[in-house]
Amino acid sequence: MSAIDAGARAPENLWRQEIRATLALAWPMVLTNLGQTAMTATDVMMMGRLGPDTLASGALGANLYFMPLIFGLGLMLATSPMIATELGRRRYSVRDLRRTVRQGLWLAILISIPIWIVLWHGEAILLAMGQEPALAHQAGIYLRWLEWAVLPFYGYIVLRSFISALERPGWALIIVFVAVACNALFNWVFMFGNLGFPAMGIAGSGLATSLSSTLMFAGMAAVVMLEKKFRRYRLFGRFWRSDWPRFNGLLRLGLPIAGILAFEVTIFNAAALLMGLIDADSLAAHAIAIQIASISFMVPLGLNQAVTVRVGLAHGAGNPEGVSRAGWTAFVIGVSFMALMGLVMVLWPHLLISAFIDLANPANARVIALAVSFLVFAALFQVFDGAQAVAAGMLRGLHDTKVPMIYAAIGYWGVGLPLGVLLAFHFGFHGVGIWIGLSSGLAVVAALLLTRWLRRDRIAPPLAFGH
């Protein structure tokens, strides 16, 4: 083989290596995300067996629970790019990683305290929002048992970020799937009063989730203390020692991530409320379409987490070519997958819908027709959603979170929601108008994020964005 042939193959081999590394990191994260979704689905199914009132109370409580939980989750996610950059830099990486993880756990404790206070008063908050007293009371009981899941969940996220940055995410997958099984068992025991325990009803579901989250954290803590590759970092050594500059760095990086998640969650909550203003069939069809889209979104979400690590490693090493290669690899994989899923939605909508509703029941005809029409636009929605999710992870690996937060506000609340309202209620597009608005908002966010990535990738070395 000539020197020219060898030189031509070297870049090709680097791209192949990046594809393999990205997929090896992403697929356990995708399955981990699906496992966490399965835990929520288990809770819903178990609550449904206690009756519609219990299910409604659980839904109210869960919505109130997830609002502050998501904000805190954004803060915890800041540990991933910081750890990856420190690993890529290599110098003092053991000490730096230990300090970052420690400050991440400190932050988990501090942010949990106000969340506990809010959730403890869940019933009063729901009553102030005008909810039915009986439902608010049951939701309040549920929240007082559920709130203790917050801290161990955050601790689990910090430790998961650590093992993912070391490119060993398989442990998180194992732990989550054990937790899914335990969560189902705990629900069965405490909700319905089995194995000699009293029947706690909806409170039992909250207890089950708290115990499962504690199990997840305990399992992850055991892994990082006992597994050979992780043990040398001594993550819990000198846990009491502060590092305020690093703590403040986590806040600076994490607050915009929390803002992005808040904008995303609230825009989808608003879309559901708007569908409810149209009619019940539109809301039901929307719930089906969004659930289908949410399942496939687990893939770009896993790629978002993987590309943050891959870009962060190259970023810390001062390797601009590696930054570019890592970002584009994940972006192409993510968008290609979502385009394929969009095609499935367009070609076989009834097959997908049949998993959620009886197609043979004439009473469901209008819901089915609406869901089919929504899935046409959900196909476009998929591509834009995948693009923005992966692009956000690419920029996060460069510690770039403030401007993406502004882009999220512009796309979701400046374009998506107003356009959806205008099309749905002024121009008579109804539910389809809301889906067009959502798709347009995601397209704007994706375009802005990609433009920023292109500019950063071209004009500056990676370390310019690390501090």
UniProtKB/Swiss-Prot annotation:
<feature type="transmembrane region" description="Helical">
    <location>
        <begin position="104"/>
        <end position="126"/>
    </location>
</feature>
<dbReference type="InterPro" id="IPR002528">
    <property type="entry name" value="MATE_fam"/>
</dbReference>
<feature type="transmembrane region" description="Helical">
    <location>
        <begin position="170"/>
        <end position="192"/>
    </location>
</feature>
<feature type="transmembrane region" description="Helical">
    <location>
        <begin position="367"/>
        <end position="384"/>
    </location>
</feature>
<keyword id="KW-1003">Cell membrane</keyword>
<protein>
    <recommendedName>
        <fullName>Probable multidrug resistance protein NorM</fullName>
    </recommendedName>
</protein>
<keyword id="KW-0997">Cell inner membrane</keyword>
<feature type="transmembrane region" description="Helical">
    <location>
        <begin position="330"/>
        <end position="352"/>
    </location>
</feature>
<keyword id="KW-0813">Transport</keyword>
<comment type="function">
    <text>Multidrug efflux pump.</text>
</comment>
<feature type="transmembrane region" description="Helical">
    <location>
        <begin position="23"/>
        <end position="42"/>
    </location>
</feature>
<dbReference type="InterPro" id="IPR050222">
    <property type="entry name" value="MATE_MdtK"/>
</dbReference>
<dbReference type="GO" id="GO:0042910">
    <property type="term" value="F:xenobiotic transmembrane transporter activity"/>
</dbReference>
<feature type="transmembrane region" description="Helical">
    <location>
        <begin position="405"/>
        <end position="427"/>
    </location>
</feature>
<feature type="transmembrane region" description="Helical">
    <location>
        <begin position="287"/>
        <end position="309"/>
    </location>
</feature>
<feature type="transmembrane region" description="Helical">
    <location>
        <begin position="202"/>
        <end position="224"/>
    </location>
</feature>
<feature type="transmembrane region" description="Helical">
    <location>
        <begin position="250"/>
        <end position="272"/>
    </location>
</feature>
<comment type="similarity">
    <text>Belongs to the multi antimicrobial extrusion (MATE) (TC 2.A.66.1) family.</text>
</comment>
<dbReference type="GO" id="GO:0006811">
    <property type="term" value="P:monoatomic ion transport"/>
</dbReference>
<dbReference type="GO" id="GO:0015297">
    <property type="term" value="F:antiporter activity"/>
</dbReference>
<dbReference type="GO" id="GO:0005886">
    <property type="term" value="C:plasma membrane"/>
</dbReference>
<keyword id="KW-0406">Ion transport</keyword>
<dbReference type="Pfam" id="PF01554">
    <property type="entry name" value="MatE"/>
</dbReference>
<keyword id="KW-0812">Transmembrane</keyword>
<keyword id="KW-1133">Transmembrane helix</keyword>
<dbReference type="InterPro" id="IPR048279">
    <property type="entry name" value="MdtK-like"/>
</dbReference>
<feature type="transmembrane region" description="Helical">
    <location>
        <begin position="62"/>
        <end position="84"/>
    </location>
</feature>
<feature type="transmembrane region" description="Helical">
    <location>
        <begin position="432"/>
        <end position="454"/>
    </location>
</feature>
<keyword id="KW-0472">Membrane</keyword>
<keyword id="KW-0050">Antiport</keyword>
<feature type="transmembrane region" description="Helical">
    <location>
        <begin position="141"/>
        <end position="163"/>
    </location>
</feature>
